[in-house]
Structures are given as C-alpha cells and as structure tokens.
C-alpha cells in the first residue's frame, strides 16, 4: 500500500487491489500496468501524474467503473465493482462518484441548472429536490446569476465550474478529475482548482485528479506518479 496517510480498508472511499489492465487487438497484447494498489481516504486529495501514455486516464476510468480491469479489483464505497451488474455499477457511480473532465461534457440543449439537476433526477429524486440542490451548488460556484444560460452562452471557466457543480450535486464520496483544468488559461485554471479544494473542505469529498500541472499537484495531500506500469508516491521535493 502507498503512503502513510492512506486509509485502511474500512475507511477508504475507493480502493484498488492488484489492479491490472492489458489491451488486446488480435494476437497483440499491450500491458498498461499490473498489480497496482491504491486506497483513498474520506476527504483526502490525491494527484496522479506521469508522462503522456503512461495510463493515467485508464487508471481513472478503472477506479470510476467506466472500464473493466484485466485483473484485480476496485471497491467503491465498500462494494466490489466486478460483482455488480452494469445497471448496479451505474447507480453506484451516480450516487458515490463525481466526474470532471478536461472538456466539460455539458449537454448543449440544456441550461446550466438543468445540467446540474441531471444526476439528482437520475438517482430517483423529484424535480423540486433536484432543482433545490442544483441551485445551491450553482450559487456556491458563483453561477447563481447564470442558471438559465446554456453552455454556449457561458465562458470556458463558467462551463467548467458548472461541470464541477454537476459532479458534486449528489454529495459523492469522491470526485475523479481527468485534467479538469487542462483546457483553461492559467488564471481560470487556478480559480477552478481553488473552487474544487474549497468544496473538498466543505463537503469532505475526496479528490483524485489526473494532472500534468506539478504546481497544482503539490497542493494536494499526496502525489502519485504512474511510471512504466508502476504507481509510486513522490516526496514533496520530487514533485
């Protein structure tokens, strides 16, 4: 296991054991990594860094149940993902995880409010509850005055703040971010990053962020480097 601050099995919001992924095309086999162990505690913030093509996004997809590992297990909120049906995995993701990507993936035909309401509606809550939770989150990310605007009417930073609100609206145990500030200018990226840290502190939501920005990575609790198929924790001086 990695890191002195890492949670024990009972307290982990996400846990991976001996995780491996190999891509197959015909007779060709391309191993990405094998035997990775990782545990993320409640409220902990973790950066994953590494060279392009190292498998960082693949690891994030496996942790989020968006892809199936070749070997090993992923546990989310104590539940083994491989033991769940596709439908059960989808419900667990919606309830326990939030996702923020480099590109916002907002639905263009819906307003900011409707986009943020969507995860709550998918969890089975009624419209009034979904609207209330979405309005509260949009206000907290500084978009209370833009709730009726569609993504095309928002700036890049506003769209990403809306995506952060959508990721957090169901109060997930962990948010997984794949270069969430990578498509923004430095000033806007800093604003969005600060927002994610503020919400992490306020809600005790864990963060696992893939980033190429070492200056941002240094501000998280732990920095893990994926290198040649192995995951290692970096000392602060090495980040």
UniProtKB/Swiss-Prot annotation:
Q: Which organism is it from?
A: Xanthomonas campestris pv. campestris (strain ATCC 33913 / DSM 3586 / NCPPB 528 / LMG 568 / P 25)
Q: What family does the entry list?
A: Belongs to the ABC transporter superfamily. Lipoprotein translocase (TC 3.A.1.125) family.
Q: Where in the cell is it found?
A: Cell inner membrane
An example of a Gene Ontology BP annotation on this entry?
Answer: transmembrane transport
Pfam families listed in its UniProt record: ABC_tran
* SUPFAM superfamilies attached to this UniProt entry: P-loop containing nucleoside triphosphate hydrolases
Q: Which gene encodes it?
A: lolD
Name all ABC transporter domain ranges. 14-239
Q: How does it sit in the membrane?
A: Peripheral membrane protein
InterPro entries xref list = AAA+_ATPase, ABC_transporter-like_ATP-bd, ABC_transpr_LolD-like, LolD_lipo_ATP-bd, MacB-like_ATP-bd, P-loop_NTPase
Q: What class of enzyme is it?
A: translocase
**Residues engaged in binding ATP:** 50-57
The protein in question is named Lipoprotein-releasing system ATP-binding protein LolD
């Amino acid at each position: 296991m990695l890191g002195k601050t890492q949670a024990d099995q009972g307290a982990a919001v996400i846990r991976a054991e001996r995780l491996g992924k190999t891509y197959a095309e015909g007779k060709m086999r391309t191993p990405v990594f094998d035997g990775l162990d990782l545990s993320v505690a409640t409220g902990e913030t973790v950066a994953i860094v590494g060279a392009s093509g190292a498998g960082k996004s693949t690891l994030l997809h496996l942790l989020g149940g968006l892809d199936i590992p070749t070997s090993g297990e992923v546990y989310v909120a104590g539940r083994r993902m491989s033991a769940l049906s596709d439908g059960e995995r989808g419900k667990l993701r919606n309830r326990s995880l939030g996702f923020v990507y480099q590109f916002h993936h907002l639905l263009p035909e819906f307003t900011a409010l409707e986009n943020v309401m969507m995860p709550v509606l998918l969890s089975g809550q009624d419209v009034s509850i979904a609207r209330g939770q979405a309005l509260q989150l949009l206000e907290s990310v500084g978009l209370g005055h833009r709730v009726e605007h569609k993504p095309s009417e928002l700036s890049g930073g506003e769209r990403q703040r809306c995506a952060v609100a959508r990721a957090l609206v169901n109060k997930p145990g962990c948010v997984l971010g794949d270069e969430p500030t990578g498509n923004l200018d430095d000033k806007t990226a800093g604003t969005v990053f600060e927002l994610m840290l503020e919400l992490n502190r306020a809600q005790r939501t864990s963060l696992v962020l893939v980033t190429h920005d070492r200056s941002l990575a240094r501000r998280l609790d732990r920095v893990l480097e994926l290198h040649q198929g192995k995951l290692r924790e970096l000392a602060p001086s090495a980040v």
